[in-house]
């Protein structure tokens, strides 16, 4: 419906899918009870964009189409995965089986840090406008796998404090908080000498990063100084925490401050039904913000 233009499907409307297409592929429980597999073309219009001539859904993604020559379009990929989780895992890590580092972790591991006060790899989970059939997103998708844990993604929350416990408890000043962290880290170093678990060093670095983020995160997340034309560019939804537009704006601010890799998840694209009712809302969430970025 968005990127895979197949005009011939209009001529094949309601005809059965040829057996050569399925090629013996096993069925899922969602389709195993179907008596037939009729072909249904997209109901949207497609147009070619840019010098590359990429075909895109021009009804729902007109702004994204303006950047067709700036985007890497990969249309040669294939997978044997027939369900969401292994497919998502393969897209994030290159393998359907969990436990391998994701792309952001590799970027952190290979490139290092440009800002000691923010993580190398940040994850933002945007809330879709239409939340019908919304599915959970697991933190294992931004796991560092067999790489040191310090390279795992750090998820910023869309409500409350961006990072849990980033603020001092009531009545605890900064110097006391620093003394507490230093004491805990000293105990962790003693534990490492006894046990030798390398993840102990990860824990030490996490405590130290959390303390430094107390100063950097409030400035990062304060959008009050963003000029009005920025909100016109990204859309009014950019003012709403947790929206895709807000996440894209936050991603820009993170990258400007030296964060190596920012990944935004925008859920609820699993349209089993009412595609024409849900797809426009999803595309409206992402089209203008992606154009602005």
Indicate residue ranges for each PLM-predicted region.
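Ligand-binding pockets and gating/stacking loops
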Residues: 1-293
């Amino acid at each position: 419906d968005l990127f895979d233009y197949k005009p011939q499907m209009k001529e094949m409307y309601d005809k059965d899918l040829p057996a050569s297409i399925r090629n013996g592929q096993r069925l899922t429980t969602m389709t195993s009870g179907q008596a037939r597999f009729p072909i249904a073309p997209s109901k949207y219009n497609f147009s070619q964009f840019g010098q590359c001539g990429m075909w895109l859904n021009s009804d729902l993604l007109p702004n994204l189409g303006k950047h067709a020559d700036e985007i890497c379009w990969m249309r040669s990929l294939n997978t044997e995965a027939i369900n969401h989780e292994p497919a998502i895992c393969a897209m994030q890590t290159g393998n359907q089986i969990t436990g391998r580092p994701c792309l952001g972790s590799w970027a952190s591991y290979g490139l290092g840090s440009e800002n000691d006060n923010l993580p190398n790899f940040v994850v933002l989970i945007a809330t879709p406008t239409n939340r019908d059939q919304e599915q959970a997103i697991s933190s294992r998708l931004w796991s560092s796998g067999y790489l040191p844990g310090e390279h795992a993604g750090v998820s910023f929350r869309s409500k409350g404090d961006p990072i849990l416990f980033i603020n001092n408890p009531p009545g605890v000043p900064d110097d006391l908080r620093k003394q507490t962290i230093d004491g805990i880290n000293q105990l962790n170093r003693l534990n490492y000498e006894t046990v030798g678990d390398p993840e102990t060093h990860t824990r030490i670095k996490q405590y130290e990063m959390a303390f430094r983020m107390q100063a950097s995160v409030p400035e990062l997340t304060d959008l009050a100084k963003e000029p009005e034309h920025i909100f016109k560019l990204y859309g009014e939804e950019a003012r709403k925490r947790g929206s895709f537009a807000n996440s894209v704006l936050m991603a820009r601010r993170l990258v400007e401050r030296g964060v190596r890799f920012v990944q935004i998840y925008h859920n609820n694209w699993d349209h089993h039904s009412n595609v024409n009712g849900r797809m426009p809302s999803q595309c409206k969430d992402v089209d203008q913000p992606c154009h602005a970025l």
